[in-house]
Swiss-Prot record:
GO terms for molecular function: 4 iron, 4 sulfur cluster binding; aconitate hydratase activity; metal ion binding. GO terms for cellular component: cytosol; mitochondrion. Catalyzes the isomerization of citrate to isocitrate via cis-aconitate. Pathway: Carbohydrate metabolism; tricarboxylic acid cycle; isocitrate from oxaloacetate: step 2/2. GO terms for biological process: tricarboxylic acid cycle. Residues 1-26 form a transit peptide. Monomer. Residues 542-555 have a biased composition (Polar residues). Keywords: 4Fe-4S, Iron, Iron-sulfur, Lyase, Metal-binding, Mitochondrion, Transit peptide, Tricarboxylic acid cycle. It catalyses: citrate = D-threo-isocitrate. It comes from Caenorhabditis elegans. Disruption phenotype: RNAi-mediated knockdown causes accumulation of citrate, leading to induction of the citrate-induced mitochondrial unfolded protein response (mtUPR). This is Probable aconitate hydratase, mitochondrial.
């Protein structure tokens, strides 16, 4: 018998949504050269927005126009910001290779023959930075051959475009090839909002949400509030687009954007390039925002034209009123930032909202004992790897070279795409970086997501790195909890590489040239777009054929077909144990680490061995050490969870504020469910993670009174009661039984709607999908 499992279809819906192909409804301008039969939806959007405006009788923000323009039932949909659940029809789905594995495994499990909307897979997360671009790429292709083959064949069979390893980072590829003003895109990566730089609503989701959209099921989103950020003045000197979002993070903090779309407007918008706007939208993920967006303007027109999409730019220009906010549109909150007076910022360490203006950084560093010597400077990532970013950084490196200086730190450059890499090589920027002492890494995420084989410091050694990345959680980049990571612009990162010091202020401080003379760096200069046009480089796209075989070996340690989670048995969840009570920040990195664990993203059982590895146990202040409340023995968190599961003991986890902050990885929800968890009880959730938990049949619950967190002991037995009358808006009750026999009753809130309650009852959203499809046959 063949040792490979051949995947067959289980069921299928009665019909599929047309891919924007009706000329009577859709404009006949293709959305991408890679999808010539899918067309811009502006006429349909206009019609739907008119229906909604006639109902609401008020001006709309840009966010509302795009979102409501994609409503499944615009005539009847309840629309109330922060209250209603919207049922939406996104234009497309994008998946990166680490999350696409589980998304495609779930889609295959659904039994459907083809995706219902244009979709793509992008290979960017599984390439480790070690020796440099070409060598690292070759090594990654060899190590991940099985996974890349699975994604390529699954994409080909089910109608999903496949961007090969080396093509670039998902968000840069989307910006270059697929994003357009008015787009509604969902992507299985938290930095999907990058596409807002071209005027689209691009939203990070878990893989199960992507499966819904690919299966032609309306996508649900709680109607977001809208935070308006008015930009006045102009960017100038050392101040860059990155500083706008670093300042916003300072104002709103890591959870200030939760449940809201951040919409930029005002005269200052016109001084920012399209890729700069992408940078700002990208890091909106760090404030918990649903997404971020800019109005259509000439910067977007120029970028679309430069990337071979002039037809789209012209069509968008015709619909500019649709692609900008109405006069008098109402925002739930307005923040004003004057770009004339904005200064460069450096945020960190350990959190992206701890902001220091460049003139205060040295003082703050000395006061807090942050290491002043910078060990590594890293530019690039999905946040800052555009041609403009590279030209500005190169202009600073060139000044140093002209004075006989090179980088004092290790210096790495991550191009965002093959197109950016080929273009900066052609235009001589790569040579400047090489002469400066820099190493150009592969077109991939690399150190930004922890794919970095760092050798210059030992684990536990206190040190500082400066990056143009987006996140700097503890251990995020190099798995060293003692590394102090600071996030800033590529300009400031490069300047600090020259000085080697965190307290260096390039606006005021002097450097010593090779000949002993003193000099100051001049403000960076850059080009929004390459004067000679973009060089596309190597062709790295595989179009789907609609046929082929997808194989998953049962002996694989990288890929594993999914088994359905068990249904709810109709009873209250009684006498559960507390696996861990987490104290402090608990991001998706703490729940399901990335880095070396990325290789197991397609194998649920194996990756579950990283559950809560770096979360701090409130009981003992330690990581990965919890007490088995049945045996009394201490052990690793995953091993303890497995023991509970083997013994038929269900468990919960207790958490603090903004639980699940960070990435969209649904493994942070799948793993607790796989290892026997039934509920996560916290003070508050990050949006994407809360939805991911619901999708997997878990109960994400919040304390009605956050102070009740302090009443809970890790040794308590937990019962969640009232599930027989589980209903939207109706709190549940938890009873915590102490070791002395006393009980504490706690009210728990939830955000489940009726459909999500059906997910819980079925055991998962995927189980519920199969039930619905089976009934429709």
């Amino acid at each position: 018998m063949n040792s490979l499992l051949r995947l067959s279809h289980l069921a299928g819906p009665a019909h599929y949504r047309a891919l924007h192909s009706s000329s009577s409804i859709w404009s006949k301008v293709a959305i991408s050269k890679f999808e010539p039969k899918s067309y811009l939806p502006y006429e349909k959007l206009s019609q739907t927005v008119k229906i909604v405006k006639d109902r609401l009788k008020r001006p709309l923000t840009l966010s509302e126009k795009i979102l409501y323009g994609h409503l499944d039932q615009p005539k009847t949909q309840d629309i109330e910001r922060g209250v209603s659940y919207l049922r939406l029809r996104p234009d497309r789905v994008a998946m990166q290779d680490a999350t696409a594995q589980m998304a495609m495994l779930q889609f295959i499990s659904s039994g459907l023959p083809k995706t219902a909307v244009p979709s793509t897979i992008h290979c960017d997360h599984l390439i480790e930075a070690q020796k440099g671009g070409a060598q690292d790429l070759a090594r990654a292709k060899d190590l991940n051959k099985e996974v890349f083959n699975f994604l390529a064949t699954a994409g080909s069979k089910y109608g999903v475009g496949f961007w090969k390893p080396g093509s670039g980072i998902i968000h840069q590829i989307i910006l270059e090839n697929y994003a357009f003003p008015g787009l509604l895109l969902i992507g299985t990566d938290s930095h999907t909002p990058n596409g807002g730089g071209l005027g689209g609503l691009c939203i990070g989701v878990g893989g199960a949400d992507a499966v819904d959209v690919m299966a032609d099921i309306p996508w649900e989103l709680k109607c977001p509030k809208v935070i308006g950020i008015k930009l006045t003045g102009k960017l100038n000197g050392w101040t860059s687009a990155k500083d706008v979002i670093l300042k916003v993070a300072d104002i709103l903090t890591v959870k200030g954007g939760t449940g809201a779309i951040v919409e930029y407007f005002g005269p200052g918008v016109d001084s920012i390039s399209a890729t700069g706007m992408g940078t700002i939208c990208n890091m909106g993920a760090e404030i918990g925002a649903t997404t971020s967006v800019f109005p259509y303007n000439e910067s977007m027109y120029k970028y679309l034209e430069a990337t071979g999409r002039k037809e789209i730019a012209e069509e968008a220009r015709k619909y500019k009123d649709l692609l900008t906010a109405d006069d008098g549109a109402n925002y739930d909150q307005i923040i004003e930032i004057n770009l004339d007076t904005l200064t460069p910022h450096v945020n960190g360490p350990f959190t992206p909202d701890l902001a220091s203006s460049i003139d205060k950084l040295g003082e703050n560093a000395k006061k807090n004992g942050w290491p002043l010597d910078v060990k590594v400077s890293l530019i690039g990532s999905c946040t800052n790897s555009s041609y403009e970013d590279m030209t500005r950084a190169a202009s600073i490196a060139k000044q140093a070279l002209d004075k006989g200086l090179k980088a004092k730190t290790i210096f790495t450059i991550t191009p965002g795409s093959e197109q950016v890499r080929a273009t900066i090589e052609r235009d001589g920027l790569s040579k400047i970086f090489a002469d400066f002492g820099g190493m150009v890494l592969a077109n991939a995420c690399g150190p930004c997501i922890g794919q970095w084989d760092r050798q210059d410091v030992k684990k536990g050694e206190k040190n500082t790195i400066v990056t143009s990345y987006n996140r700097n959680f503890t251990g995020r980049n190099d798995a060293n909890p003692a590394t102090h990571g600071f996030v800033t612009s590529p300009d400031i990162t490069t300047a600090m590489a020259i000085s080697g010091r965190l307290d260096f202020n390039p606006l005021t401080d002097e450097l010593t040239a090779a000949d002993g003379s003193k000099f100051k760096l001049q403000a960076p200069t850059g080009l929004d777009l390459p004067p000679k046009g973009y060089d596309p480089g190597e062709d790295t796209f595989q179009a789907p054929s609609g046929s082929g075989q997808v194989d998953v070996s049962p002996s694989s340690d990288r890929l594993q077909l999914l088994s359905p989670f068990d249904k709810w048995d109709g009873k209250d969840l009684e006498d559960m144990k507390i696996l861990i009570k987490v104290t402090g920040k608990c991001t998706t990195d703490h729940i399901s680490a990335a880095g070396p664990w990325l290789k197991y993203r397609g194998h649920l059982d194996n990756i579950s061995n990283n559950l809560f590895l770096t979360a701090i146990n409130a009981d003992n202040g330690e990581m990965n050490k919890v007490k088995n409340q049945v045996t009394g023995e201490y052990g690793a968190v995953p091993a303890t969870a497995r023991k509970y599961k083997a013994d038929g003991v269900r468990w919960v986890a207790i958490g603090d504020e903004n639980y699940g902050e960070g990435s969209s990885r649904e493994h942070a929800a799948l793993e607790p469910r796989h290892l026997g968890g039934r509920a996560i009880i916290v003070k508050s959730f990050a949006r994407i993670h809360e939805t991911n938990l619901k999708k997997q049949g878990m109960l994400p619950l919040t304390f009605a009174n956050p102070a009740d967190y302090d009443k809970i002991d890790p040794s308590d037995n937990v019962s969640i009661v009232g599930l027989s009358s589980f209903a939207p808006g109706k709190p549940l009750t938890a009873i915590f039984k102490k070791t002395n026999g006393s009980k504490v009753e706690v009210t728990l809130n939830h955000t489940f709607n009726e459909q999500q309650i059906e997910w819980f009852k079925a055991g998962s959203a995927l189980n519920r999908m199969k039930e619905v499809f089976a009934k429709s046959k």
